[in-house]
Structure formats: structure tokens, C-alpha cells
């Protein structure tokens, strides 16, 4: 199970997975979050370019959510206005924590991460059409020592029971 389609693509290119077992198991949404003091002050993405608001994003080179956020801001035509306001973080958890603590006004995380907000709130959910699909692929590794058990586990991950659990944690 990978949080990165690109990483799974690399495994497939290197012929390290059983290609017939590969599938996109989960999906996620990208959301704009705000710290509690922003409630009532910001209610849409356009305000990011006009207001004096800092934005926490994951590093573009290493954090998929950061890359997706840039795609959204490019698609909405606001990247040039918001780029100078961005404070980059090492991962999505760091983005969530710095916004939830009130150190930075807004940030972009996955909807599954936003469920962990204690003080902050979700300002907006970005359209899936504004960024590459956020999918979590799964596949059996070719040199798996216990393929039968691994296949049963993959089957379980696709079951209704597992899907309901994933939904509780913000995945689709």
C-alpha cells in the first residue's frame, strides 16, 4: 500500500510487483484548513490572494499534498499571488499541527488528516478536477515470502468492512 501513485509506478516499472494485483484502493480529498481565529474571516480560496494570510504547504519536492496544492493554485490562477505567503513544512502532519496550533493561519492537507484538527476547521474542499487524482494504490510484492496470506490481506482491504473503516478515517 502506497500513498504515492508515482512510487507504485516506479515499483511496477522495475517489475517488483505482481501487476495483476495492482489497483487503486483508496481516494482522498485535498482541503484548505484554517486556524480557529480565521473563522468568519475567511470562507473561500480567493481570499488567500488578497488577505494578509500565510499558507502552510508540504515541500513541493517531497510532499505529494504540496504538489497537489500547487496544481490547485495554478488551476485557479492564484499561484503567483500566494507563492510569497507560503511557509513550507516537511510533511502534511507538520502542516496540520502548525495551523491547528495557530502559528500559521491556513494550510492545505488531505481530508483524512483534517479529521485530526482540534482547534482549526476546514475552510474549503478542493475539486478533484483541479489536481491529479489522489489515490492510494496497492499491489502484491513479487518476492513476498507468504503470497497466499498477502493476497488474502489485499482481498480484506477491498472488503466492505475495510472500506467502512477507511471511510471513518476520511478516505473514499
Q: What function would you assign to each model-found segment?
A:
Residues 2-27, 31-172:
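Exported/periplasmic ABC-transporter solute-binding proteins
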